[in-house]
């Protein structure tokens, strides 16, 4: 059964673009590397890595405390991984 989502149920938080398109701060790169190590999920530094970084910052701030369901949609970012492969070299989970 399809899920209905009303526009007023969607919140877009756009304050985590960092230095700009494809320009990551060291803090974001460290987060992406640590996230890959801990969760086994690779995030590109152009889109999804910045988005997950922002999402976790919002969780820490309590932005979703009153929410019953919160969804993070990982949209891919595969091609953004190739130029950033050195971030993931030698990573092991754990």
Feature roles, as predicted:
Residues 6-66:
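Active-site-adjacent helical/loop segments in soluble small-molecule enzymes
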Residues 56-94:
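Phosphate-binding loop/pocket of nucleotide- and phosphate-handling active sites
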């Amino acid at each position: 059964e399809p899920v209905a989502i009303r526009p007023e149920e969607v919140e877009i938080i756009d304050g985590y673009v960092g230095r700009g398109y494809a320009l990551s701060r060291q803090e974001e790169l460290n987060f992406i590397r640590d996230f890959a190590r801990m969760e086994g999920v690779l995030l590109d530094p152009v889109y999804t890595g910045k988005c997950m970084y922002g999402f976790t910052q919002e969780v820490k701030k309590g932005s979703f405390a009153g929410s019953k369901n919160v969804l993070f949609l990982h949209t891919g970012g595969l091609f953004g991984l190739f130029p950033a492969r050195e971030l993931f070299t030698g990573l092991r989970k754990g």
